[in-house]
A protein has these predicted regions:
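Perimembrane helix-loop-helix junctions
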Residues: 142, 171-200
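Short acidic/glycine- and proline-prone juxtamembrane loop motifs at membrane-interface regions
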Residues: 112-126
Length: 380
């Protein structure tokens, strides 16, 4: 956690404002609310984004905080997302605390996530909200019957997801399916009060505003170049690399020195190998898992698959955006997989496992330092 917060705060304090993707557009959204009590109309960049993070930022500006402090909202949200990831792993495997440590480490050491958490954007809050949605999803499949507190939690995170960003819809879909399926024989009409009433209270006004302003539940989307079939390989490559390096404010990834590219490629290959081994271990362990644990794993994986699918569909039908941060809202599944591999290795070959884990962590931190230094040279 200290590494994550340290790099996020370093980006927030050292990189001049406006040098993260669309940062000035996000800042203008906040200024509109803070100084004019208005949301951006159609034609203004980022007008399609739900307003939660911008309302929080406007409150800071109205309180007299400097504009750079808006980046700290992202840093705090990023830390909350890491905590939620650890809690997900802890609840899925309560007797294996190493698994939670591995999941948190996976989320905290992603250089691209640290960069996002140091910029003015709605993505860091969306990542955090997505993680908390999936935590509630795990708690739902773990609970034999609905309780007042759990129903309220589900309603609150649903409302938060609906007013944060559309990238939260993938984990939200997993939560809603889990509620309906797992509690299908125990849901009563009275349960609709927290499950539907709280989201309406939290986010309903935003969608009503859209109907009045745009005559549509959602604001008009911004269209651009679409993903073509012959671009698929490059799209996947750039999406994967964006988990491991900063982005330019003009769009696209920042150019790393050769040493950084080598470290990045090693980490991507390692991540791929870890995911494959985690899948193998999951198949082997599946019969021994409790029913609710299987449901939790399926829900987390389904959210990840939906996030990937929605990224492809959006890029093919609206505008091409090979940005891995959009997938981090449902990153609990790969985080859990990484934690499971670590926990399994600690039992089987502790010395080798801890050595390899330490090397991976050191490589990730080195890549974070290279990315930060490269950004400082370019924009500092």
């Amino acid at each position: 956690m200290a590494v994550f917060v340290g790099f996020a705060v370093a980006y927030a304090l050292l990189i001049p404002l406006g040098n993260s993707p669309d940062e000035l557009s996000h800042l203008n959204y906040v200024r509109l609310i803070a100084h004019h009590a208005a949301f951006p109309p159609a034609g203004v960049r980022e007008h399609q984004q739900p307003p939660l993070v911008y309302l929080l930022g406007a409150a800071l500006l109205r309180a007299g905080a400097p504009e750079r402090s808006l980046r700290l909202i992202s840093a705090a949200a990023g830390a909350a997302g890491v905590i939620a990831g650890a809690l997900i792993a802890r609840n899925v495997a309560p007797r294996r605390p190493v698994l939670a440590v591995g999941a948190a480490g996976f989320l905290a050491l992603l250089p691209g996530s640290q960069f996002v958490a140091g910029s003015i954007s709605d993505d860091s809050l969306a990542i955090a909200v997505g993680a908390w949605v999936l935590l509630v999803c795990v708690l739902v499949v773990k609970a034999p019957a609905p309780s007042g507190r759990l129903l309220a939690a589900a309603g609150v995170v649903t409302g938060a997801a609906l007013i944060t960003k559309q990238t939260d819809w993938a984990p939200l879909a997993a939560l809603l399916v889990a509620i309906v399926w797992h509690w299908r024989t125990k849901l009563r009409w009275r349960h609709a009060v927290p499950l539907a009433g709280l989201p309406l209270l939290i986010a309903g006004w935003w969608y009503a505003r859209n109907l009045v302003t745009f005559h549509s539940v959602l604001p008009p989307l911004v269209h651009g170049d679409k993903l073509q079939l012959n671009q698929a390989r490059g799209f996947v490559s750039q999406t994967a690399r964006s988990w491991f390096r900063p982005e330019r404010f003009q769009g696209g990834l920042i150019t790393l020195p050769r040493a950084g590219v080598v470290v990045e490629e090693v980490l991507i290959a390692t991540l791929f190998a870890v995911m494959l081994y985690a899948a193998y271990r999951a198949v082997r362990a599946w019969p021994a898992l409790q029913t609710w644990q299987r449901s939790a794993v399926v829900a987390l994986c389904a959210a990840a698959v939906l996030a990937v699918a929605s990224s492809f569909v959006n890029s093919a039908t609206v505008i091409i955006q090979p940005q891995g941060r959009y997938l981090l809202t449902a990153a609990a599944a790969p985080a859990l997989a990484a934690g499971a591999v670590l926990a399994s290795g600690v039992v089987r070959r502790p010395r080798l496992t801890l050595t390899l884990a330490g090397l991976c962590a050191a490589a990730a931190m080195a890549l974070s330092a290279i990315g930060l230094h490269t950004s400082l040279v370019a924009y500092g």
